[in-house]
UniProtKB/Swiss-Prot annotation:
Pfam families: DEAD, Helicase_C. Belongs to the DEAD box helicase family. DDX5/DBP2 subfamily. This is ATP-dependent RNA helicase dbp2. It comes from Emericella nidulans (strain FGSC A4 / ATCC 38163 / CBS 112.46 / NRRL 194 / M139) (Aspergillus nidulans). Associates with polysomes. Residues 171-346 form the Helicase ATP-binding domain. The Q motif is unique to and characteristic of the DEAD box family of RNA helicases and controls ATP binding and hydrolysis.
Amino acid sequence: MSSYGGSGGYQRDSYRSGGGGGYSNGYSNGHGGGYGGRGGGYGGGGGSGYGGGYGGGGYGGGGYGRGGGGAGAGAGGDRMGNLGSGLKKQDWDLDTLPKFEKSFYKEHPDVTARSQREVDEFRKKCEMTVQGRDVPRPVETFDEAGFPQYVLSEVKAQGFEKPTAIQSQGWPMALSGRDVVGIAETGSGKTLSYCLPAIVHINAQPLLAPGDGPIVLILAPTRELAVQIQAEISKFGKSSRIRNTCVYGGVPKGPQIRDLSRGVEVCIATPGRLIDMLEAGRTNLRRVTYLVLDEADRMLDMGFEPQIRKIISQIRPDRQTCMWSATWPKEVRQLASDFLNNYIQVNIGSMDLSANHRITQIVEVISEFEKRDRMIKHLEKIMENRGNKCLVFTGTKRIADEITRFLRQDGWPALSIHGDKQQQERDWVLNEFKTGKSPIMVATDVASRGIDVRDITHVINYDYPNNSEDYVHRIGRTGRAGAKGTAITFFTTDNAKQARDLVTILSEAKQQIDPRLAEMVRYSGGGGHGGGYGRWGGRGGGRGRGGNFTASNAAPLGNNRRW
């Protein structure tokens, strides 16, 4: 998608960042008085609010979804299932394929001059381990990385002091043309680890001819992460006139098709929508010589493995592949061994699942019914500082909407983001949160990776996630870029099966452990999951069609302004 606000975005010869005022204009005056009348409550009439109210009986006759529910079938997103069945099998004859350049790394004299002991000490200090044959030495400054001046000047203009650990080792690895696996926590600077070598790679290739597809393909699990990667590529590729587009579901295909047909050197995509484009003949992957799989573990968690395999089958086998992941489970290892050749690997931090040590983790063992009161108590304290930002995670989209409505009616400036929201609403919510206009964002796990808001100070896990990996990723939204953060987690007896893993993570990070949590570990084995949607009866039917905004984000703020 070209930019957020639909204002032209990244066209062939113009690099407008697009979308500047796109959000606010698109939504009249933000919260202002723009919500109009609410019709007959949440379920009754549509009301005259945002473009036809909340979509008629969106919340199902009366109750929270006991009745027929709205017509809403979600906002699109990436289809699963039979995607890719229309793709032709490629027979690659490497002898007839055009040759391409992928090795650009020349070791800086300062790097060569270091003794092996100095290299080992640097790696130890950065908690870095490497594997594979002939792994290049890490660089300690931007100048040592050997980037061309047009890349270096842009990096320095951003005010970075020195490379992060993953960049120190990742840049020489990627610039050398080798296949690379990088394992590092989210927020460690891995996007630049592959973006800058990608720009060097593109500039060494022949120019695109009409009808050519991209040279660099970056696959990402979510729309949010894809847009964030696009922002980095745009920033650093500007001086080389590198064009890019972002291809993801949940938005109209028109602008994406237009960008692809004009020609782009970089395509950032979620797997489902990219396969749609390939099947429709809107682009091809014959020119791709630099492939990136970002957050590979997350893509596999989300069930994208069949699509990833189909996409890779369309790319020449002598390409360079870089795979980035926050964890290294067996499924990710299998993917690496299937698609990477003679790869070299860098790990930052422990190979065991561990949380960022700059995050204070507070776990409270409470009942389901205490959660709302506890959340309000914490928010009262958190929001004493106007600069704080709080991300609240829930287990389901329904609870995300309920809590957002509850908070707004209680006077808190909260908005929610999840997979059933239209893309433009998600973009708008994210922007309100980033700019601090709405410092409380309620989210499901779709937002737990790839949302790059650097200054989140607090995370509240209203519902505990299904596994400890997701717990670590959720709390990793705070404490980024060297800052400290706080994560507050509500843990109920329904979560007892997860207690042991959680205690392991807390102990490793030297955090206090609630005695009731320790007790649960001793007696766990029971617990299990309660009866589905519990208190409110059936799930009801999504959002209803119609209004531009879902009811939760359009709920008026109560008179008792809390912030």
